[in-house]
């Protein structure tokens, strides 16, 4: 899994005002990998938690692996560095360990005030979704004319300038990843492809493809999700395996990914869950356990992003 810690804390959908304490709790529990994104609008809180623990002497910056993501409205080459610097300013960091292209799809660029301002107090944060999700009269996203291969060139420049140590992608299908890897003049391969992955969407083919190309896989939503009525925590197979190992269902779901050589980034703001989710290195699932969990696959994707389905680079029109 390269230099990426096997388990990280995701700040996706984390309740505003509670992220800083969650990050501090996570560092105390042993987390060193933190995953965030401009689109989550909580980079500032993540950074505050990190700075507090560094100031305490609990951890050093070089011990941490901090990842964030380029949003779709900033795929134009001239906007990539601006977007990265805005994230660094929000986090109050000098560099990122990993910067990801959040989706392969480029959207209409943001308001000029966003581009001109490197302050998080700009128009875009007063009306974040207006800027982040430009919609047409049919409530479908307005695309840009960008190509993610051009965006990648600007991402590579960030490595050269030292703003980021590694670059990667998220939500890319195998054809898109292959196109990127075959790009003439490629200077840096993506370190990882961050994808939705859980027992109802095992992503066997995409994981195999990525790993065969020496691109690691990072699993988001590893516990599924209860809001869509898909609660893996209550799945009887998962509960039975958890009982057999004396572990929680969440720990089984996280360990499942680790044994596939997949990096995993569960999210939580609850101290007990944060601690529990990283206590997954003192047991192993049997091959029988792994096979039973893999058999739960339904190819059920939760993060469909339907307002983008007409985009030329929508990633989910093919099987993987």
UniProtKB/Swiss-Prot annotation:
Substrate binds at residue 102. The record marks 69 as: Lowers pKa of active site Tyr. The keyword Membrane does not apply. The keyword Signal does not apply. It is found in: Cytoplasm. Catalyzes the NADPH-dependent reduction of 1,5-anhydro-D-fructose (AF) to 1,5-anhydro-D-glucitol. Has low NADPH-dependent reductase activity towards 9,10-phenanthrenequinone (in vitro). Monomer. This is 1,5-anhydro-D-fructose reductase. It comes from Homo sapiens (Human). The gene is AKR1E2.
